[in-house]
Amino acid sequence: MDASKSSKKRKAVTRDVEEEAGVFSGDELQVDVLDGALSDNANDLSSDEDVSDSEIELVDDFSDEEDGDEEEELDSDEIPSDGGESFKKASGTGNARDESSSDEEQLNYRIEKDANGNDRYVYDEINPDDNSDYSDVEENANTIGNIPLSFYDQYPHIGYDINGKKIMRPATGEALDALLDSIEIPKGWTGLTDPSTGKPLELSQDELELLRKVQMNEIPEEGYNPYEPTVEWFSSKQEIMPLSAAPEPKRRFVPSKHEAKRVMKIVKAIREGRILPYKPPTEEEDKEQDVVNYDLWADETERPDHPMHIPAPKLPPPGYEESYHPPPEYLPDKKERKAWEEADPEDREREYLPNDFGSLRKVPGYESFVKEKFERCLDLYLAPRVRRSKLNIDPESLLPKLPSPEELKPFPTACATVFRGHKGRVRTLAVDPSGLWLATGGDDGTARVWELLTGRQLWSVKLSEEDPVNVVRWRPGKDAVILAAAAGDDIFLAVPPIADPKIEKTSLEIIDAGWGYAASKPPPSAAEENKKNVPPQWIRPSLSLAESGVCAVIPLRYVVKSLSWHRRGDYFVTVCPGSSTPASVAISIHTLSKHLTQFPFRRRIKGGGPPQTAHFHPSKPILFVANQRTIRAYDLSRQLLVKIIQPGARWISSFDIHPTSSTASGGDNLIVGSYDRRLLWHDLELSQRPYKTLRYHRKAIRSVRFHPSGRYPLFADASDDGSLQIFHGSVTGDMLSNASIVPLKVLKGHKITGELGVLDVDWHPREAWCVSAGADGTCRLWM
């Protein structure tokens, strides 16, 4: 019975170790400790004081966290008195077992005798490891707390340990011992005395290692990596495009000339002796530099005022409310006093409230006196004062006197006809020279011809399936009916079947005359065709387009946005403003009679960005080319740059030349529309800058146009705000008088679609009528 109990007890506090296990659970287990425990203390488990610390460590090393959960907690009262004898027998038999066996049972308790002589099981205290939050006080630690050791100077001990025993004062060596200790310095020696123990203070190995790392500028913490990859919390998203693709400037790689000049100045000054090395001043020089005290009242003569002296303005005289005994009507009542006190100091009408003191001797000091004087001094010191002579001028007299719009009629005032049929935006329109037909082009890729007065559609052709028709223009002259339309990167020349057969036949002959000239030229070689600046060859249209009236196609390979005819009808210029268009092929001039295309510019126009539009002068061999910010005039006969016009706009959208521009009519006049909502009038005889700048639109201006005949001095502009504005602009031949500009009418009727309003405008050649094309898919005739 006793043997079974003791065996159960051993199972509760120990665990078996497999024979193949080569590694114990405790890292601190040592072989010499294990041998000593088995050889010396195996038969002496019942003694009280013979159990060594090595056995305790051995039991702790063999114990495991998992086994600790399964162990049963045993108290000394639960163990019977005869359990000790059975345990002794079991322990005696255990010594006879094989020492190499891994089934050794280690005990974590010892047997002592209680007061009645019975066996008492005393369990060892648990030693927490480094990961535990609990730590026991060392047995020899001084536990007196924060009390100074000077209190124990008259006692042989210096404190008490955890068990209440006295800690005796360590013996002090003689001077010879101190000398020997200083010669043979032990590891961790500091030369200091530990105040808690009275012994020499020695540093541990960990403290020495910490000091070594600090001295060597190393990181004290183990496993810390100071070069971990940076975590970009706010800029971790990779940017594909650079913030600035500008090339590095040359000044980054060339020595600074500015600094070289400054250095040479200093070198020259040193050579000339103007810059001397520093020398400490002598006592005589210090005496010469002493501060001299001047008598402030030595010269009391009055000095004349400065010529620019302006006397300070006088203070206003005091009123009745500032009197110490004001009339009763100036005294505030309770409501007014409360409102004044609750108001903000900046919102008060006055800085004080009138009071009635009865007599002058009862008047106290004014609390805001110093503040008011200080603010007045600040005003006199900081605020500039200027003498001004007042001019009595009527503002109305400064404005120019404009004639009444009723005196400048006729001009369009109302919508007469609406043209509907396009799907999507109507990008362009043009009225033919006879004034009978209207040609339009839109996003649906079709070019249509309408009867102007009735709005009836007469002819339509599908020029492109994907690309919109960007521009349509009639050939000048009434002898032929030829329509030029640009869709995508092709230009189409068509003869709509709307005129009488004689005019239609003449139109076909004009276009067909160029095929013979083109056939006489040798075809370009394969190497020339691969070049980008090779002029394109005019080709015949497809069968479906030929049946619709298209006679010739010019493949430019780049999108055309502008087309303008010469006044004689044999030349027209086109502009491809795309950013991907090479500079040498952006502007092209086409000859109708020869079926010839030429690129007059070899390089991109300097300054102002890519070209936007171009027009021929109505009476001179001059070509005007506009890029984003400037307009350049080229003399085609002399092949020279004549003039550079600077409108000052951010982005030029369109421009037009006055039809009567010549030296006889007072010089050339232009109007320029820009995407920054400005309409600019240029008189080239006055300046390259704008003569007038008109800002009447809320959005970008898309198109501007003069009336083609000199009969009506009218011009109009079209804007994305859905409105057209009609102006009167008269130009006289007198060089001493300037052009007069009068706003006449604002025409509204188009709906804003997709942030776009009116895209194009054109005038009737003989009447004061205009036609507009809108993004809402309609065209309107204004009369």
Curated annotation (Swiss-Prot):
Subcellular location: Nucleus, Nucleolus; Nucleus, Nucleoplasm
Originating organism: Aspergillus oryzae (strain ATCC 42149 / RIB 40)
Domain of life according to the entry: Eukaryota
Biological processes per GO annotation: maturation of 5.8S rRNA from tricistronic rRNA transcript (SSU-rRNA, 5.8S rRNA, LSU-rRNA); maturation of LSU-rRNA from tricistronic rRNA transcript (SSU-rRNA, 5.8S rRNA, LSU-rRNA)
Compositional bias annotation for Basic and acidic residues: 110-123, 331-352
Compositional bias (Acidic residues): 46-80
Start and stop residues of the WD repeats: 421-460, 464-504, 555-600, 606-644, 647-692, 696-737, 753-783
Oligomer status and interactors: Component of the NOP7 complex, composed of erb1, nop7 and ytm1. The complex is held together by erb1, which interacts with nop7 via its N-terminal domain and with ytm1 via a high-affinity interaction between the seven-bladed beta-propeller domains of the 2 proteins. The NOP7 complex associates with the 66S pre-ribosome.
Any one GO molecular-function label of the UniProt entry: ribonucleoprotein complex binding
Extent of Pro residues compositional bias: 313-330
GO CC, one annotated term: nucleoplasm
Disordered: annotated segments: 1-133, 302-352
Protein name: Ribosome biogenesis protein erb1
Record function comment: Component of the NOP7 complex, which is required for maturation of the 25S and 5.8S ribosomal RNAs and formation of the 60S ribosome.
Compositionally biased residues, Basic residues: 1-12
Primary location recorded for the protein, binned into one broad class: nucleus
Classification of source organism: Eukaryota, Fungi, Dikarya, Ascomycota, Pezizomycotina
Keywords from the named record: Nucleus, Repeat, Ribosome biogenesis, rRNA processing, WD repeat
